[in-house]
A protein has these predicted regions:
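An aromatic/glycine/proline-enriched structural segment found at the starts
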Residues: 24-29, 249-308, 399, 502-506, ...
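Sec-dependent signal peptide recognition
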Residues: 2-10
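C-terminal motif of bacterial Sec signal peptides marking the signal peptidase cleavage site
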Residues: 16-19
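His/Glu-based metal-binding/catalytic segments typifying zinc-dependent metallopeptidases
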Residues: 66-68, 75, 188-196, 200, ...
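Scaffold signal of the M16-like zinc-metallopeptidase fold and its non-catalytic homologs
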Residues: 95, 99-101, 145-159, 176-246, ...
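M16/insulysin-pitrilysin zinc metalloprotease superfamily fold
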Residues: 99, 134-179, 183, 366-422, ...
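M16/MPP (pitrilysin/insulinase) zinc-metallopeptidase core fold and M16-derived inactive scaffolds
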Residues: 66-151, 162-164, 196-197, 217-220, ...
Length: 620
């Protein structure tokens, strides 16, 4: 991680507290601006002081990751468990960004961008989470963005303006009584595009079959065939249920003044709410008595080949995301069993001639999924695929995996964890904390990766990996063999069914009802084309030139010479990783050889050397 802390300055150890008031040492059990400090701990893995609060009145949870990083991040997330395939979590993510009580413009963030120095501005929907992260290096901008985001999620205009759901979710569109009735909407059209991919259809079917009785069996993004079932009444009730501070998880990252952050959030928003007694929980899916099998088809264009176009996928529900060591173990197994070039399952399937692309993925969730998928296969390969996978897993359980390969994979995992290669360190902390925070009320577990990593390193001298294969794969009935094969004409059938559904509905409507839909179509178009009023635009906080600092951050470089080669050195917190760049002066290289220098640069690292094969380099 590239922070600006100097390792050789003892005083820099105090910088980790820069997000806190220098006049006040935060103490667990004490109350600060309506927030009780629950836990305070220095997390060496991210070189930051982390403070977990609970807002006494509203029940909101808040984690401050305090360090000297000026790239401050604010995020508010909600546990949003879908109750159907209508796409309500996804549509709500869009909808709350269409104006709010204090900022009544059609798209506050489009306006904000014109007067903001944000380094990140987005919103995302997952299987059980909707999250709203924003970052800025400017203090005033940071609080402006925080203000707009909080108002968006807690005071959206969706209650008074049904056109927001119509625009962002779905609506009937009818230009005249002679035209066909159609479905339109931002998310509706987006998800039609998403489900034009067979990979996404496969994922949808896997979750449907593995989790038939809980929220993970539903598509939080919305399935095109189901989105038009969403009503304004249900939409409002969803916001009331899930977008309450008691169900919120707020993350603050960086060097902003913590007292100021807490005071603002409490005063402007949370103090107006009372905590709910009922907590949003997703019940666990009961395990199966025997492995499931399912087969479906996906559309392909007429005339395109169907041979070698089938997906075969074995899926296992394996433990929980709250078990950090187990999650790391399966990250290693995904590589060691399948994804590595010399992985035994990859080689066995290649030798059998099943498919042309095999991939393992591990999805961290309340109940994790380990997936082995072969593309470009055929339906008749199903039984051989299953037989080869289980035979190979049995061999691995009995004889183990190649230790040098496993060591290389673990070393790479450790490097990636320590490096945290992202310009948005706050966003990285968000993704690290959310699973254990949501499902075990412990965000620290996601940040403190050294302990589970040490457990996984034991795989080099123990049967840790082999035991995981036995317990969670070979002896696991909560599993699914999914076959997804191509079908000519399926897309035409889907479109015909949708058109017939719309036509039947249209013929059932009275002339007055048709007039109402046409009026709604016109009004929505007028709304989309109407400019915001100057009064509404004036509510959006903008930076002025005087708000922008003129200081330039300076990185002092130590210059020295080693073996007649100039060396530039900079001390920084890099989590024990040394970064070295070698630069070669090409001024004497003939012009005609310049393209070959570029080719050489592309090849280096992808070829063997005098002392190591490419495979050995990859493992090390």
């Amino acid at each position: 991680m590239k922070y600006t802390i100097r390792l050789y300055l003892l005083i820099a150890l105090l910088a980790i507290f820069s997000g806190c008031s220098k006049k006040e040492a935060f103490k667990p059990g004490e109350i600060y601006n309506g927030f009780t400090l629950v836990k305070k701990q220095f997390v060496e893995e991210i070189n930051a002081e982390c403070l977990l609060f609970r807002h006494d009145k509203s029940g909101a949870q808040l984690l401050k990751v305090a360090n000297d990083d000026p790239n401050k991040l604010f995020n508010i997330a909600f546990k949003t468990a879908p109750e159907n395939d209508w796409g309500t979590p996804h549509i709500m993510e869009h909808a709350v960004l269409n104006g709010s009580k204090n900022f009544p413009v059609k798209s506050p963030f489009d306006v904000l961008i014109q007067g903001s120095l944000n380094t990140f501005l987005n919103a995302m929907t997952g299987k059980d989470i909707t999250t709203y992260p924003v970052a800025s290096m400017n203090d005033k901008d940071y609080f402006n963005l925080m203000h707009v985001y909080l108002d968006a999620v807690f005071n959206p205009l969706i209650y008074s303006d049904p056109k927001i759901l119509q625009q962002e979710g779905w609506h009937y569109e009818l230009g005249s009584k002679d035209e066909p009735l159609t479905y339109k909407g931002v998310v509706y059209n987006e998800m039609k595009g998403v489900y034009s991919s067979p990979q996404n259809e496969l994922e949808y079917l896997v979750y449907k079959n593995l989790f038939p009785d809980n929220a993970y069996g539903f598509e939080s993004g919305g399935h095109p065939s189901e989105i038009p079932k969403l009503t304004q009444e249900y939409f409002i009730s969803f916001h009331q249920k899930f977008y309450h501070p008691s169900n919120s998880y707020i993350l603050l990252y960086g060097n902003a003044d913590l007292n100021k952050e807490l005071e603002f959030i409490d005063r402007e928003y949370l103090s107006g709410y009372d905590a709910l007694e009922e907590k949003v929980e997703i019940p666990l899916q009961k395990s199966f008595n025997t492995m499931k099998e399912a087969e479906k088809t996906y559309p392909v264009q007429e005339g395109s080949p169907v041979a070698d176009q089938t997906f075969l996928s074995l899926n296992f529900v394996a433990g929980s995301s709250t078990d950090r060591a187990l999650c790391m173990t399966f990250d290693v197994l995904a590589q060691a069993l399948v994804n590595h070039e010399s992985a035994p399952l990859r080689l066995a399937l290649q030798e059998a001639g099943i498919g042309r692309d095999v991939r393992a993925e591990f999805q961290e969730m309340q109940q994790n999924i380990f997936q082995i998928t072969v593309q470009n296969a055929n339906p008749e390969d199903k039984d051989r695929f299953r037989e080869i996978v289980f035979k190979t897993l049995q061999e691995v359980a009995e004889t183990g995996l190649e230790k040098t390969m496993v060591e290389g994979i673990i070393n790479r995992m450790e490097f990636n964890l320590k490096e945290g290669d992202s310009a948005q360190k706050g966003l990285m902390c968000l993704f690290m904390t959310y699973q254990p925070w949501f499902h075990a009320d412990d965000p620290f577990a996601g940040l403190e990766f050294n302990k589970p990593l040490e457990e996984v390193k034991k795989a080099l001298n123990t049967n840790l990996l082999e035991s995981a294969v036995k317990e969670h794969l070979l002896s696991n009935n909560h599993a699914l063999l999914m076959v997804l094969k191509p079908e000519h004409g399926l897309q035409a059938k889907i479109e015909q069914a949708t058109n017939e559904e719309l036509n039947i509905y249209k013929t059932s409507l009275s002339s007055e009802n048709l007039d109402n839909i046409m009026v709604q179509t016109t009004r929505l178009l007028e709304h989309q084309q109407r400019e915001d009023t100057p009064e509404a635009l004036a509510t959006i906080p903008m930076l002025e030139l005087s708000d922008i600092g003129k200081e330039i951050e300076w990185y002092p470089i130590n210059e020295k010479t080693v073996a007649n080669v100039p060396v530039l050195h900079y001390d920084d917190f890099t989590n024990d990783i040394v970064y070295t760049n070698l630069y070669f002066d090409l001024k004497d290289l003939p012009q005609e050889l310049i393209p070959y220098a570029s080719l050489l640069n592309a090849l280096l690292g992808k070829l063997g050397t005098e002392n190591y094969t490419f495979g050995e380099l990859a493992m090390n």
